[in-house]
């Protein structure tokens, strides 16, 4: 018997069919259908009451609060704050996946924020280095949001718009006297005429007129260590974009990501919290007027990397309202963070778990007993411990557990695990501001010695290896030296900022976009070039890490707030409206250009430049991206030279180092107990000309480009590698020809053919080793395998997976038990192939200590 088709959304009919299947057809069909239709139709029957907003969810009724916004163009928003999406992860539930919340019978007031998840607070204030730039001079206000801490913290906040701003604006432009138009109205007479003349349907948001609204779930950043969704008010974005916005609290730090590397504590509880929040959203958002088939996750910094990781997890599949091709969400926006950065994944979880256990008196060999001991400790004792990770890495964060994250993120991306999601991602122009601020003592720029030290320390921590480190160090210095203005301290500061930005953010984002677009999946890339003018950040700073967040949330449209104390201009308001339109369009259709066009006539009488720009999809070939700033334009190949330095050249230099070990003088590795930093103010800068002092003058520091150091130059290494390879190929060819000729005359005259090698022929063995590093198997998967002479082609090096080396922790082999389930990359033993952004195999070989250590105890990267 076919069911009559009504005009209800598809997901309601899916709910009806699912109910029929679940209950079976044994009961009278009429009663079964009636019960199912009533259950599914209840989703549509609930219209929010502005006076008493009450919603009945699957777990009980909740009451929200209506909030007016400080802008005439923005309609009121109904807020539901502190809504539980999981049971409290306390007691035995600590270090366990979340469970659904218990239902409640009374009406629950959702008018106040719930407690935030436990996090480390130093003297009542969050560590400055971990926060976005606009928070650094307002820490007292920020810290007030995280004072109320509890392990019972798994709550979310829902912001529901009450009016369609775009529809109201057009209606008021046509008929200003209508009751729906508030006194004074948002539009001038000229603007009214402009909008009245444009009567086309292209300005109408057809898909959202009266139907379920798209949903945007925001994941906050904070290096997986601090922060809360309570900090981010989604009201303006919800009202202006006509979408439902949700912010989430999830477990952080030790409580959210501790892993013993086995079944005792698998880790990734914070990610599982986010998955549970998405599951709750998928099953309940219909009661708030939301569309469970149009859920977009977005986040900045570590929140962006969480977004990326969620697209790679099979736990994100299984939306009850959809078919098998739809998951808990359908689209993703990763702002200034992907799963390929050095700080995105912890590859040493068991080591840090042991360190924590030792500090709190739980240092037992059995991991089950260790976890039981940690479960009995007060949470404050755990989160306050000083666990120092390697620089540019994290101690407690997502791990490759073979389950939530089944493999290295780059491998999962190559396998197309995220191809079913539409993805938008991007970076800010000057993400690495905080790293540079820790080096700069004044506004005068960076001295040559500080520049040399910063680069050396960077290489030591991320690419340190015993031999040939100088090659990589000097190459990076060379590439990030502005040779037209190399003596200018301000120029050095600018290039150093670019170095940190390119390595930690830009190159991982481009690599992620390349991998996603390779499958033909919709990919959009942006570069954010604007920040508000304020005295709280240096005048020389570009758009820093997190500077896009207030524009995404629409803060400029309501003026300065205590969290965003900036004097926003009309340009800021216009740009925020543009960004919100792009973001919400993407949430609605997967295309940031549709369905709502760029129109900010309520701010400026003249059209903005974004009206003439079409944001083109990204592809690996063209690498088109949108320059978001006051002068927008679509450009191609963002920072291509520097990106390919990290993705292509650096891995080759790492492999060439293995070759140079056979051909250059071996330098003894400095003792791990000896660390130093150059202290002389008049040391010769790396960009200066050749020194005129005698080389035997101990007071004169030789230039890194001196003749006696040319053994370490890239050119010489390449020359030696290619020359040795060609020589050996010639030897092989000559030997094969001679052997063939000799074999013909074998019956007549036996002659001894030259031997390829002997057991004690060290020189020739070295040549064979060199050759093995220069040949490439002609297989499509580009992996270094066994090489046969008839299958080889000459090349400079065998490039490893360029992202696998990017995140490798610089410490020694992780502490893993025999029943380990955490999947450490299989290239750790022996010579490690280079991950583009992190390959150091021995963290204790750092030759230079950082002069400005980070104050936070768990993470050294502000994301």
From Swiss-Prot:
Membrane topology field: Single-pass type I membrane protein
Ranges for region Disordered: 183-212, 670-708, 842-863
Signal peptide: 1-45
Alphabetized InterPro entries for the sequence: AB_hydrolase_fold (IPR029058), CarbesteraseB (IPR002018), Carboxylesterase_B_CS (IPR019819), Neuroligin/BSAL (IPR051093), Nlgn (IPR000460)
One cellular component term from this protein's GO annotations in UniProt: filopodium tip
Family indicated by similarity: Belongs to the type-B carboxylesterase/lipase family.
Record protein name field: Neuroligin-1
Provenance organism: Homo sapiens
């Amino acid at each position: 018997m076919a069911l009559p088709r009504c005009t209800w959304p598809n997901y309601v009919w899916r709910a009806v069919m699912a109910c029929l299947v679940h209950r079976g057809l044994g009961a009278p069909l009429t009663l079964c259908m009636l019960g199912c239709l009533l259950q599914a139709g209840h989703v549509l029957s609930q219209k929010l009451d502005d006076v008493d907003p009450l919603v009945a969810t699957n777990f009980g009724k909740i009451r929200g609060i209506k909030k007016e916004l400080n802008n005439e163009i923005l309609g009121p928003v109904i807020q539901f704050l502190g809504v539980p999406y999981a049971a409290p992860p306390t007691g035995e539930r600590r270090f366990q996946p979340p469970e659904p919340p218990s239902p409640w019978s009374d009406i629950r007031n959702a008018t106040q924020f719930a407690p935030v998840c436990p996090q480390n607070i130093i003297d009542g204030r969050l560590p400055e280095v971990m926060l976005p730039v606009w928070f650094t001079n307002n820490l007292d206000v920020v810290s007030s949001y995280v004072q109320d801490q509890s392990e019972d913290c798994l709550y979310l906040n829902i912001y529901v718009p009450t009016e369609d701003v775009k529809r109201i604006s057009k209606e008021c432009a046509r008929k200003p006297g209508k009751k729906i138009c508030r006194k004074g109205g948002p539009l001038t007479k000229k603007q009214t005429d402009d909008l009245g003349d444009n009567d086309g349907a292209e300005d109408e948001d057809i898909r959202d007129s009266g139907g379920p609204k798209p949903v945007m779930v925001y994941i906050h950043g904070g290096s997986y260590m601090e922060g809360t969704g309570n900090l981010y008010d989604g009201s303006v974005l919800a009202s202006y974009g006509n979408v439902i916005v949700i912010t989430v609290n999830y477990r952080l730090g030790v409580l959210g990501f501790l892993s013993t590397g086995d079944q005792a504590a698998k880790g990734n509880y914070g990610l599982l919290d986010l998955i549970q929040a998405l599951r709750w959203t998928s099953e309940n958002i219909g009661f708030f007027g939301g569309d469970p088939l149009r859920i977009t996750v977005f986040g900045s910094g570590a929140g962006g990397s969480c977004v990326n990781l969620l697209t790679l997890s099979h736990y994100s599949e299984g939306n009850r309202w959809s078919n098998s091709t739809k998951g808990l969400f359908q689209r993703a926006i990763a702002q200034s963070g992907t799963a390929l950065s050095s700080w995105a994944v912890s590859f040493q979880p068991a080591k840090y778990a042991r360190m924590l256990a030792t500090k709190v008196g739980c240092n037992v060999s059995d991991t089950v007993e260790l976890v039981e001991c940690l479960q009995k400790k007060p949470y404050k004792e755990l989160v306050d411990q000083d666990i120092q990770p390697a620089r540019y890495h994290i101690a407690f964060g997502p791990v490759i557990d073979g389950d939530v994250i089944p493999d290295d993120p780059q491998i999962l991306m190559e396998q197309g695990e995220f191809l079913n999601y539409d993805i938008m991602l991007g970076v800010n122009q000057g993400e690495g501001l905080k790293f540079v601020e820790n080096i700069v003592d004044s506004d005068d720029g960076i001295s040559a010695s500080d520049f040399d030290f910063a680069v050396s320390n960077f290489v030591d921590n991320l690419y340190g290896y015993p031999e040939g480190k100088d090659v990589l160090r000097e190459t990076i210095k060379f590439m990030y030296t502005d040779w037209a203005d190399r003596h200018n301290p301000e120029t050095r500061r600018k290039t150093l900022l670019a170095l940190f930005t390119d390595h930690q953010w830009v190159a991982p984002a481009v690599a992620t976009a390349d991998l996603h677009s390779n499958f033909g999946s919709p990919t959009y890339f942006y570069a954010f070039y604007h920040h508000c003018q304020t005295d709280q950040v240096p005048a020389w700073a570009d758009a820093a890490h997190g500077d896009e967040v207030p524009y995404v949330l629409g803060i400029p449209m309501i003026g300065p707030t205590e969290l965003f104390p900036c004097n926003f201009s009309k340009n800021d308001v216009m740009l925020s409206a543009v960004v919100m339109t792009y973001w919400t369009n993407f949430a609605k259709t997967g295309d940031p250009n549709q369905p709502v066009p760029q129109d900010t006539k309520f701010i400026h009488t003249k059209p903005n430049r974004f009206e003439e720009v079409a944001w083109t999809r990204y592809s690996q070939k063209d690498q088109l991206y949108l320059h978001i700033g006051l002068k927008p334009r679509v450009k191609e190949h963002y920072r291509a030279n520097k990106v390919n330095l990290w993705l292509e050249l650096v891995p080759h230099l790492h492999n060439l180092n293995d070759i140079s070990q056979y051909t250059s003088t071996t330098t003894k590795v400095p003792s791990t107990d000896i660390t130093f930093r150059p202290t002389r103010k008049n040391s010769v800068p790396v960009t200066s000309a050749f020194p005129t002092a005698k080389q035997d003058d101990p007071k004169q520091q030789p230039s890194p480009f001196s003749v006696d150091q040319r053994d370490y130059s890239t050119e010489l290494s390449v020359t030696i590698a290619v020359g040795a390879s060609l020589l050996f190929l010639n030897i092989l060819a000559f030997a094969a020809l001679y052997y063939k000729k000799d074999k013909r005359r074998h019956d007549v005259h036996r002659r001894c053919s030259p031997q390829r090698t002997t057991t004690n022929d060290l020189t020739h063995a070295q040549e064979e080793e060199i050759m093995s590093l220069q040949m490439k198997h002609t297989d499509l998967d580009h992996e270094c395998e066994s090489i046969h002479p008839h299958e080889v082609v000459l090349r400079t090096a065998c490039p490893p997976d360029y992202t696998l080396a990017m995140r490798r922790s610089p410490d020694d082999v992780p502490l893993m038990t025999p029943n380990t389930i955490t999947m450490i990359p299989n290239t750790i033993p022996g010579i490690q192939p280079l991950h583009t952004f992190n390959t150091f195999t021995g963290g204790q070989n750092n030759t230079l200590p950082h002069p400005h250590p980070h104050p936070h105890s768990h993470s050294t990267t502000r994301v």
